[in-house]
């Protein structure tokens, strides 16, 4: 048994059965290969950008960008690449008054065939690799200021990449939807049909996974009304079409909705929703505290929120799925807060716990217990957060 198979077996053994079934050996092993692939791409991109030579001696991100004539906005993406390569032992870093200084320790990683190994195990994980490759192809345009991340990754010609990426057939993404569905199934009341509001529903893969999960248990009648919402019309229409086609009997209302604005002012009645659901959405709220307070406003007393998220096990830890998103403005240009959101991107369990407590939620739970798992498996970062609005308040 090779080391990745052994790692997969030990990790899965640490999960309770209803969670374990969402983390197949294929998923765990392909995730590790994708992590290697992302690290290797980051190293190759530094070479292509001519930035590797700038770190033969210690330098800050800003110094290296300025010497090469690259735009300042690339600092976030470059800092992540350097942090990831540092964590993997290829760079070293030191903190100084002028900021972190990085220096190359050993040659950047060579191509290990990680993509090919992952695809040999399960070809359905291809979309994750394709998105990274697409970004890498245009990375010089981004660093030079000729294109934004949105222009590279979200042009109309590339939307199909994202339909494939966020699809439940994508081995490396579907776990977010399946785990979220498990958490919602546990949180939904069993005494009455519920009104569910999904935020940032995208093309519908999270809603489909949830309704499939409820259908298996014979609990589709638990949904009294499902608000499927999404701010981007193209995704909204696609998601609504998929949901109506597969679950025509579910009471569905699809509407454009922006979590960064008042939900009540957009037509969601105060204290009308039993459960607010979102998958990999809330972490990109422009003002996290404001968005959570807006969500609380529409949740019934005693109602729940379930957020299936990438969860950063420890502060500052570079997570490979961030690589592509660090090039997108709505991911990085957010309101920060030292307690609940010290930086852009994914939050730690402690950040989520503090953010939800501050905004009037209690009974915080995390499925699975990422904090405990991270002691032995530091690269485990998928979790479903559940919290409730107190019954009296």
Question: What is each PLM-predicted segment?
Answer:
Residues 193, 223, 272-274:
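Local beta-strand N-terminus motif with an aromatic residue
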Residues 273-289:
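A short SAM/SAH-binding and catalytic strip from SAM-dependent methyltransferases
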Residues 263-276:
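A short acidic, Gly/Pro-enriched loop at the edge of an enzyme's catalytic core
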Residues 195-197, 201-264:
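Class I SAM-dependent methyltransferase SAM/SAH-binding core
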């Amino acid at each position: 048994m090779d080391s990745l198979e052994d790692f997969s077996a030990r990790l899965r053994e640490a999960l309770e059965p209803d969670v374990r079934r969402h983390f197949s050996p294929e998923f765990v092993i392909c995730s590790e290969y994708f992590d290697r692939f992302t690290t290797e791409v980051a190293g190759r991109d530094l070479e292509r950008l001519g930035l590797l030579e700038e770190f033969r001696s210690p330098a800050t991100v800003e110094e290296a960008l300025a010497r090469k004539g690259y735009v300042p906005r690339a600092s976030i993406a470059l800092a992540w690449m350097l942090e990831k390569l540092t964590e993997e032992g290829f760079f070293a870093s030191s903190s100084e008054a002028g900021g972190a200084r990085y220096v190359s320790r050993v040659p950047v990683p060579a191509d290990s065939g990680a993509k090919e190994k992952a695809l040999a195990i399960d070809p359905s994980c291809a979309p994750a690799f394709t998105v990274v490759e697409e970004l890498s192809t245009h990375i010089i345009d981004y660093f030079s200021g000729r294109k934004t991340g949105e222009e590279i990754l979200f042009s109309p010609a590339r939307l199909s990449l994202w339909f494939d990426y966020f699809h439940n057939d994508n081995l490396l993404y579907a776990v977010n939807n399946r785990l979220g569905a498990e958490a919602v199934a546990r949180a939904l009341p069993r005494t009455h049909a519920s009104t569910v509001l999904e935020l940032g529903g995208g093309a519908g893969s999270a809603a489909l996974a949830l309704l499939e999960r409820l259908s298996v248990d014979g609990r589709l009648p638990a949904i009294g009304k499902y608000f499927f919402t999404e701010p981007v019309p193209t995704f909204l229409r696609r998601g609504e079409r998929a949901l109506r086609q597969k679950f025509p009997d579910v009471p569905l209302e699809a509407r454009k909705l922006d979590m960064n604005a008042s939900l009540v002012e957009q037509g969601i009645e105060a204290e009308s929703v039993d459960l607010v659901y979102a998958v990999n959405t809330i972490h990109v709220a422009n003002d996290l505290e404001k968005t959570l307070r807006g969500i609380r406003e529409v949740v019934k007393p005693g109602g729940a929120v379930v957020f299936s998220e990438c969860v950063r096990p420890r502060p500052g830890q570079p997570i490979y799925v961030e690589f592509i998103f660090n090039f997108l403005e709505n991911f990085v240009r957010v309101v920060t807060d030292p307690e609940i959101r010290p930086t852009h991107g994914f939050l730690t369990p402690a950040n989520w716990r503090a953010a939800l407590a501050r905004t009037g939620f209690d009974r915080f739970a995390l499925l699975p217990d990422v904090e405990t798992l991270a002691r032995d498996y530091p690269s485990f970062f998928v979790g479903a957060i559940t919290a409730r609005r107190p019954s009296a308040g």
